[in-house]
């Protein structure tokens, strides 16, 4: 689409993912064995024919920038368009950090102006879904809208986590509440917007002048423009997941191991592209038992794996058992280990006779809001020495060496 530019907001820290985002931005977190979260939004763009893309980064962007590079895996290494990493920078008027989602777009007006598009699509870089943005744009045009917000129904119990909208019979948005304590509906914004560029450009310029604004699309821009302009809700009935918590991240990964998963990463008509290492095929020894699991390239499995997701280059030693767990790339698990209900981040080394996820559940002594399930999380580049036992709902930070037992709920 020659008259469309996509801007992907990828600067989020993802604090609710705890140690998983201590070293990297949330969109760079691995998902589904071989992907990173941003791959799904980038793939949606190119599958929809959008090849002019800006990725707005901020928090710990190094790994994310390295992953995207010049965009070759997504066919974005091109002279006309392609992908551009847009990091915050100093100007004569502004400091270096983006001060909200709307401010991030405002500070990159010149990038969009260079393409002189009719439409701009604003997207989040950390959600799991497949969407043909052509359908969204066609709907936007049919409604003669100045802005369109993709939305879906959510359970009332979850509505306060979202931007919630009230619409009329034509799906025109007449009220918008950002994460309300008492939601008036269950129609939730997915953080996916289409705007007429000439319109939103002026709105952003005016918003930047307002010292009382938080410069956020959900809190400021959408509530303001619905008062006078044609802003519509686009109902989306496909799979969409915000994997913003430890539990939702773990659950969404394990959903992929079902015989018929709710989200299809194997769809030949809507491929998910990624930048991954060239590795040999996985090796599964004759003594191994593997059931309902995703096993990525370069894995060597000598133990038993069930209902788990293994990223590239994972090694599991003889006699070890891995159940209901997400194991990220280049993790080394020794012999005779037992691991259940765990998320183990990249480059972790686990010795022999280690037990993880055992015992009775206990509340987290680190952060009850972030760590509130039976899932134990091991941060990147840590070492768990042989014969260590770690309970349920435990946390091991990044770059740690663990040589003592942790009871359920404890952290190091």
UniProtKB/Swiss-Prot annotation:
Query: What is the E.C. number?
Result: 2.7.7.27
* Keyword list, A-Z: ATP-binding, Carbohydrate metabolism, Glycogen biosynthesis, Glycogen metabolism, Nucleotide-binding, Nucleotidyltransferase, Transferase
Which reactions does this protein catalyse?
Answer: alpha-D-glucose 1-phosphate + ATP + H(+) = ADP-alpha-D-glucose + diphosphate
Gene Ontology molecular-function annotations: ATP binding; glucose-1-phosphate adenylyltransferase activity
Question: Which residues, if any, are the signal sequence?
Answer: none
Q: Where does alpha-D-glucose 1-phosphate bind?
A: 98, 163, 178-179, 189
Q: Which NCBIfam families match?
A: glgC, PRK05293.1
Q: Which family does it belong to?
A: Belongs to the bacterial/plant glucose-1-phosphate adenylyltransferase family.
Subunit structure as annotated in this protein's UniProt entry = Homotetramer.
Q: What does this protein do?
A: Involved in the biosynthesis of ADP-glucose, a building block required for the elongation reactions to produce glycogen. Catalyzes the reaction between ATP and alpha-D-glucose 1-phosphate (G1P) to produce pyrophosphate and ADP-Glc.
Q: What protein name applies here?
A: Glucose-1-phosphate adenylyltransferase
Q: Which organism is it from?
A: Thermosipho africanus (strain TCF52B)
